[in-house]
Amino acid sequence: MSRKPFIAGNWKMNKNPEEAKAFIEAVASKLPSSELVEAGIAAPALTLSTVLEAAKGSELKIAAQNSYFENSGAFTGENSPKVLAEMGTDYVVIGHSERRDYFHETDQDINKKAKAIFANGLTPIICCGESLETYEAGKAVEFVGAQVSAALAGLSEEQVSSLVIAYEPIWAIGTGKSATQDDAQNMCKAVRDVVAADFGQAVADKVRVQYGGSVKPENVAEYMACPDVDGALVGGASLEAESFLALLDFVK
């Protein structure tokens, strides 16, 4: 089955509104055809409205980096999925290892967030990935599989078919280390196999699975050549306009 590649830049806690606007203006008119590849930026909350405004009329998709599982209430500091939808956001990244590690988010939190995101007409990008210790112990498939199953519990086949799963080995995020092509393929296939076991092969064949972890313009084509890698969630290499555009060159 043909799945459209999706390259998403995750800015993390970088860029002020002025810098964000300049970036979007620099890339918006230079993107490859959206028939070939989907391109997106996950912007921090304080620049999101600026980025959405700057991206209007372009094919660039915009994601939030987090949202809560309630639409409103006494949840100081959280982002409402309802308001994100009203603003025009397309995607929400949830379950990133930094959120799990620093902010103690659980698989159950991520599952509740996924349901709230879908309830508001948005699409989640659900992150999963193992630590170096888990990887070296040979337990990566088991660990990541449990993360994926828990995150997707209770979702419909239609919902799962449309979401994105980003496999990011924690030991490769921002470290300069990157998984081998075989590692990326094997783990992204393992993610798809979990979806197939839980929701059926037809659903699994529609799910887009991204690889993330020190992806750069120099290695993105290698990963994109893998049959079960449908895109990339990219950190550092997405912070400069030229580098972000270069990540999309693999379609040429």
From Swiss-Prot:
It is an enzyme of class 5 (isomerase). GO terms for molecular function: triose-phosphate isomerase activity. The keyword Flavoprotein does not apply. It is found in: Cytoplasm. The active site is at residues 96, 168. Its EC number is 5.3.1.1. Signal peptide: none annotated. InterPro entries: Aldolase_TIM, TIM_sf, TrioseP_Isoase_bac/euk, Triosephosphate_isomerase, Triosephosphate_isomerase_AS. Transmembrane segments: none annotated. Substrate binds at residues 10-12, 174, 214, 235-236. GO terms for biological process: gluconeogenesis; glyceraldehyde-3-phosphate biosynthetic process; glycerol catabolic process; glycolytic process. Pfam families: TIM. HAMAP family: TIM_B. PANTHER family: TRIOSEPHOSPHATE ISOMERASE. Homodimer. This is Triosephosphate isomerase.
